[in-house]
């Protein structure tokens, strides 16, 4: 849908850049753009009262250190107490577990994150360097006039305009959808996750990865002490409904020795002082914006999941949020310098990233040969080979 005709208001505030979405990508971009530009962050939710759905995406590779330093975030990041990433053990290409040592990575092992603390720290840094945050905005009225994007929130009763508009709204891609940009969804992958309370005997810090007949698992102990367990399956899988219950999800996970040894046992779980935590479901499949159409819209950019959303098996979501914020900051500099086609290099980089990602994703999903005949695996192998 094209931008609506903008009604004139006398209380419209002028900015250089408006970022819709105060998640990792939007907040990182705000850090990078200040103090050169006047930056407004608009967030649909009220962050102080946001729904208590634990975020998924708990790791950063060592290569992220360069970006964190560039954004002025690294010292604060280290002080936040994220845990160094240790080994990964996987039952993937074969049922027998195989160990992978992160110390082989020349960029360093990376980190397991306290995701909530990481996001809060990014936003706090953006505000410290002078970005302005307005939260609880709800649906935004969107228009464009005289080369300016114009937005207004009915909840806040305030108008804003800027020559640059950023969609950092995550997988919803709310601003891109309003502008009629197509989004290609590769598959209907769903992530079911549960955050388990601390268990005294669980001191394991490894990332555990298991292929299953109709999907795949991962589990890791977070810096806060809780353990996340996640299962990824098709959205139309008949087992999906039953696995939304913690008892069923845990029972299925315990069928894998690699997971069973770090999960709580049955005795007393969900009884009295040990309540069963909820299971959360969220879309997790690959998706990409129409990058050619994106380049054709002056002053409009997409970052993070709003541009490209990665399958969690790639462990690239948070790194991509930071990397796309850096690339977009450079494009915005080119725009304000008056250069033609400021987005061209950024779009080309996104397209290259997505091409490499799909190639690696195909190789990853081709690993569990023992499951190739099952619909979950056969569907992905066929789609990624095309």
Question: Which functions belong to the PLM regions below?
Answer:
Residues 125-268:
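Predominantly flavin-linked oxidoreductase catalytic cores and closely associated redox partners
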Residues 103-124, 174, 239-244:
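Short beta-strand to alpha-helix junction loop
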Residues 330-386:
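C-terminal helical "tail/cap" subdomain of flavin- and related membrane-associated enzymes
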Residues 51-91:
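N-terminal FAD cofactor-binding segment of flavoenzymes
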Residues 31-56:
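Glycine-rich FAD pyrophosphate-binding loop
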Residues 237-329, 336, 340-344:
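FAD/FMN-dependent oxidoreductases across multiple families
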Residues 26-27:
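N-terminal Rossmann-fold NAD(P) dinucleotide-binding loop
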């Amino acid at each position: 849908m094209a931008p609506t005709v903008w009604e004139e208001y006398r209380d419209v505030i002028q900015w250089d850049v408006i970022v819709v979405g105060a998640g990792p990508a939007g907040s990182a971009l705000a850090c990078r753009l200040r103090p050169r530009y006047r930056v407004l962050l608009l967030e649909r939710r009220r962050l102080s009262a946001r729904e208590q759905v634990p975020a998924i995406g708990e790791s950063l590779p060592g290569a992220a250190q360069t970006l964190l330093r560039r954004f002025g975030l690294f010292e604060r990041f280290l002080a936040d107490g994220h845990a160094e990433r240790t080994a990964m053990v996987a039952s993937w290409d074969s049922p027998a577990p195989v160990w992978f040592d992160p110390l082989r990575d020349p960029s360093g092992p990376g980190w397991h994150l306290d995701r909530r603390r990481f996001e809060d720290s990014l936003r706090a840094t953006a505000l410290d360097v002078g970005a302005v945050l307005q939260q609880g905005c709800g649906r935004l009225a969107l228009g464009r006039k005289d080369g300016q994007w114009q937005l207004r929130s009915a909840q806040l009763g305030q108008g804003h305009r800027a020559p640059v508009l950023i969609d950092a709204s995550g997988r919803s891609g709310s601003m891109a959808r309003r502008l009629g940009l197509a989004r290609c969804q590769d598959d209907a992958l769903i992530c079911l996750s549960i955050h388990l309370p601390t268990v005294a005997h669980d001191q394991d810090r490894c990332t555990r990865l298991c292929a299953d007949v109709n999907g795949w698992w991962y589990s890791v102990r977070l810096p806060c002490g809780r353990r996340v367990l996640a299962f990824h399956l098709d959205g139309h899988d008949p087992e999906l409904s039953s696995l939304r219950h913690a008892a069923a999800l845990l029972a299925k996970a315990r069928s894998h020795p690699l997971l069973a040894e770090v999960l709580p046992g049955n005795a007393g779980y969900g009884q009295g002082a040990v309540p069963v935590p909820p299971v959360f479901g969220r879309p997790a499949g690959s998706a990409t914006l129409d990058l050619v159409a994106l380049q054709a819209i002056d002053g409009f950019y997409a970052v993070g999941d709003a541009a490209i959303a990665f399958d969690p098996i790639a462990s690239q979501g948070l790194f991509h949020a930071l990397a796309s914020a850096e690339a977009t900051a450079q494009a915005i500099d080119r725009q304000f310098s008056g250069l033609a086609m400021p987005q061209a290099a950024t779009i080309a980089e996104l397209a290259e990233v997505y091409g490499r990602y799909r190639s690696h994703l195909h190789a990853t999903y081709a690993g569990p040969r023992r499951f190739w005949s099952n619909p979950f695996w056969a569907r992905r192998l066929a789609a990624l080979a095309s």
